Amino acid sequence: MQLIRGRSNVSQCLSSCVLTIGNFDGVHLGHQAILRHLRQKADELNLPMAVMLFEPQPREYFLGDKAPARLMRLRDKLYYLKQAGVDVVIIAKFDRTFANLPAQQFIEDWLVRKLNVKFLSIGDDFKFGAKRQGNFALLQQAGEKFGFTVEDSRSFCLDELRISSTAIREALANDDLKLAEKLLGRPYRILGRVIHGNELGRT
């Protein structure tokens, strides 16, 4: 899996793609279903399958310490995206410049010129661009103008509960590990590096 950081490196590494955009925090069952469908589209079109992430996540940029805790670190997210068959991950730096980027400019600069997207899978509630003025309808209009297909990635439910990173956080907050694991599609793990101390407790 190829990792591309920053706008300036995209065109050098990628000539065209099928794309989805999001946080993919937890890479849960809903994310996995989206990625399986995108993999099929990529194979049909004979194009690489790409995921665009933002660092920091938009909520972290706007809310700071009040933003929801992540379900996993970026390193672990990249591991699970690779396991899902993703060919390319683009990490866009979410800073003041990006936050103030007009929605139409994001479409033309990123989706059209840089990525040359042919198929875009996105939630119908996706908002983007300065003041969140960009939406699903604007992307559909752009697709007709610039020649790419836009598809609603839809929500997925398990036992009538919408699968989402928020639902998993709530399950963990309520000590309901079984529900969190069902929504994730695997056991919940906190991964980290072991730091060895001075071993003063040894006899």
Place the predicted regions along the sequence by residue.
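Active-site cores that bind ATP or allylic diphosphates and position pyrophosphate for catalysis
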Residues: 108, 112-203
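A short acidic, often aromatic-flanked loop/helix-cap motif at beta-alpha or helix-coil junctions
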Residues: 9-12, 96-99, 156-161
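Conserved beta-strand termini and adjacent loop/short-helix elements that scaffold enzyme active sites
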Residues: 6, 52-54, 92-94, 153-155, ...
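N-terminal catalytic cores of NTP/NDP-binding nucleotidyl/phosphoryl-transfer enzymes
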Residues: 11-73
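N-terminal Rossmann-like or analogous alpha/beta NTP/dinucleotide-binding catalytic cores
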Residues: 60-124, 128-146
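Short acidic-hydrophobic, aromatic-tinged amphipathic segments that line or gate anion-handling sites
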Residues: 2-9
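Residue-level detector of anion-binding/catalytic polar loops
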Residues: 48, 87, 149
